[in-house]
A protein has these predicted regions:
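Extracellular ectodomain surface segments
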Residues: 1-27, 76, 85-119, 168, ...
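Extracellular/luminal low-complexity segments enriched in Ser/Thr/Pro
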Residues: 45-55, 137-147, 229-239
């Protein structure tokens, strides 16, 4: 009998028998065999392919029976040796993230080979993400600059160097950001001298339309909402301090205010 087999490799052994009695018909059968083997009674072929779960020793008993019911048994053990299997990934990647919100996904793996040590690594990740190779945690918080799609590849490597990779894309959706004012107010003016200051603003959200307005200003000043120009000439009656509040509003209604005082000297 063939008493050795290798995991994932086809095994075959043909039982043959003879009988000294001329004319006896011999019947072949398998009395005991593991489930991964099949036996062809017509040909005597015992065959099958063991899996990782079949690694170890398996008892087999084959029998030949003659016309008068006399039998001969062949009992033996087949030892299935292990072949290293690649690890497998058992977690489903989280492929959506939101700007300014914490993203996390735990990369989980397994290996059918008992005692294999698995090493986790990040092959490709965007800069806003970090990967903990001890726990498999991929985490981070994307900013407005990270809105869009980001390629990620995570890898698991077993003791013998076999690997499995999980490649996916994380799509970061935008959250509207308030605009910011980028200009510094002019806080002094002189009587009878033209005063001017241009409000400028920016928004990190591409495509946002910014609307400029004056919430509070003295009467001697005018504000051009199209250009952001605050201008005017104070008279003697305007000598003193004047409160001003200018505002920028984005497409979604978020605002930024600039409040300051203009001191008019005599």
């Amino acid at each position: 009998a063939m008493t050795t087999a290798a995991q994932d490799v086809a095994y075959s052994y043909t039982l043959t028998a003879i009988d000294s009695d001329v004319g006896d018909v011999l019947t072949l059968s398998a009395i005991n065999k593991p489930s991964w083997l099949s036996f062809n009674a017509a040909t005597g072929l015992l065959s099958g392919t063991p899996s990782n779960a079949d690694v170890g020793s398996h008892a087999v008993t084959l029998r030949v029976t003659d016309t008068d019911g006399l039998t001969a048994d062949q009992s033996f053990s087949i030892t299935v040796t292990n072949s290293n299997d690649a690890p497998t990934i058992i977690s489903t990647a989280t492929m959506a993230a939101v700007q300014d919100a914490v993203y996390s996904y735990t990369f989980a793996t397994t290996d059918v080979d008992v005692d294999d040590v698995l090493t986790l690594s990040a092959v490709t990740i965007p800069s806003w993400l970090s990967f903990n190779s001890a726990t498999g945690l991929l985490s981070g918080t994307p900013s407005n600059a990270d809105v869009g799609s980001h390629a990620v590849t995570l890898r698991v490597t077993d003791t013998d160097g076999l690997t499995a990779e999980q490649s996916f894309s994380i799509t970061v959706t935008n959250v509207n950001d308030a605009p910011t004012i980028s200009s510094m107010a002019m806080t002094t003016a002189a009587q009878d001298v033209a005063y001017s200051y241009t409000l400028t603003a920016i928004d990190s959200d591409v495509g946002d339309v910014l609307t400029l307005s004056a919430i509070n200003k003295p009467s001697w000043l005018s504000f051009n909402a199209a250009t952001g120009l605050l201008s005017g000439t104070p008279s003697n009656a305007d000598v003193g301090s004047h409160a001003v509040t200018l505002r920028v509003t984005d497409t979604d209604g978020l605002t930024a205010d600039q409040s300051f005082s203009i001191t008019v000297t005599n």
